[in-house]
Swiss-Prot record:
E.C. code: 2.7.8.7
Taxonomic lineage: Bacteria, Bacillati, Cyanobacteriota, Cyanophyceae, Gloeobacterales
Major location (coarse): cytoplasm
Identification of the protein by name: Holo-[acyl-carrier-protein] synthase
Binding locations of Mg(2+): 13, 63
Keywords for the protein's UniProt record, in alphabetical order: Cytoplasm, Fatty acid biosynthesis, Fatty acid metabolism, Lipid biosynthesis, Lipid metabolism, Magnesium, Metal-binding, Transferase
Residues passing through the membrane, by range: none
InterPro entries, per the entry: 4-PPantetheinyl_Trfase_dom, 4-PPantetheinyl_Trfase_dom_sf, ACPS, Ppantetheine-prot_Trfase_dom
Amino acid sequence: MAGQTFLHRIGTDLVHIPRIEGMLERYGKQFLNRVYTEGEQHYCLASKPHRANRLAGRWAAKEAVTKALGTGWRGVGYRDIEVVRLASGEPTICLNGRAVLLVERFGRLDWQVSFSHDREYAVATVSVIGFF
């Protein structure tokens, strides 16, 4: 875009799905409420055969966001980063709460999210373009 400064960053994270299954079995709703928004829980738990895969993918996406932004988790909670689905079904990122403070300097953020699952692993790659 002519006349605009932008930054393009990418983050990726890999999650062992049985780890998420174990946390879900051990901590149940407490785990879900600590990590996932109500919308994420609704989507992930709607498909019992795929719920651990979906939860693991969203965990990976949240981690990938912090890597793409280069901020780590400094003062940001898991629920401050939310994976939402557009009307098209495409996943994207919505920042809430303290995560918004990390990106104040950008006028606009464009997100791309990609998930993949293979047996016991879920991976998410997040691309963000920030316009100043």
